[in-house]
Amino acid sequence: MNKFKVLVLNSDMDGVGYHRILSPYSCFNHPDIEVDIRLLMDSTLPLHDEGFLSQYKIIVFNKSIPFRTPEYKQNFMEMVKRQNIKIIFDLDDYWVLSNAHPNYKMWKEQNAQGVVEQQIREADAITTTTKFLAEKIAEFNPNVTVVPNSVNLKEQQWISDKKRTEKVRFLWGGGITHLVDLRLLKPAFEK
């Protein structure tokens, strides 16, 4: 029996790309399913080659697949449809930005909100992080599943080596786009 092949397109190796795509799909282990994880920045990735794409049953991606032109995207979508390949779009964050967001101006200029909403409509299924996002996504595509963020606790970075102490330690990890969220914690630390 031939293995069921899944092409997982990863946009980066940090943050979202790592925790939503690379880590979970690297741990995926099923005897009848082969997961092929590729970096989108790999210039040898032939997403325009129907012969290459035809070996896969599912394509998974987060954020977007950066096509050079709308025609490339259209050709890709037509090939995927001809080959009956299912598209799973992983969406980890709300795509409607407030004007306080550092990328708001660029987001508006590039109609990024509209692009994300179109990707939601086009996908066969969407995975997301929370019930809140699932409800927002369902307005465009009802085939949405919550897959919470997770970490591989067997990785060295998560192996605890803590020493007992009376001190309270707090660790926060995130990018500049989460600064507004971090400010919500300020009153608790002022007590």
Predicted regions and their residues:
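Nucleotide-sugar donor phosphate/pyrophosphate-binding loop at the beta->alpha transition
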Residues: 43-47, 86, 97-118, 153, ...
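Conserved catalytic-core segment of nucleotide-activated headgroup transferases in glycan assembly
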Residues: 10-27, 36, 152-159, 163-191
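N-terminal pre-catalytic "stem/leader" segment of glycosyltransferase-like enzymes
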Residues: 1-67, 181
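An aromatic- and histidine-rich active-site surface loop
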Residues: 63-82, 182-184
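Membrane-proximal helix-turn-helix segments that form the acceptor-binding/catalytic region
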Residues: 75-82, 106-126
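Short beta-strand/turn micro-motifs composed of small residues
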Residues: 8-10, 91, 128-130, 148, ...
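Active-site proximal beta-strand in glycosyltransferases
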Residues: 58-59, 80-97
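Donor nucleotide-sugar binding/catalytic pocket of nucleotide-sugar-dependent glycosyltransferases
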Residues: 121-158
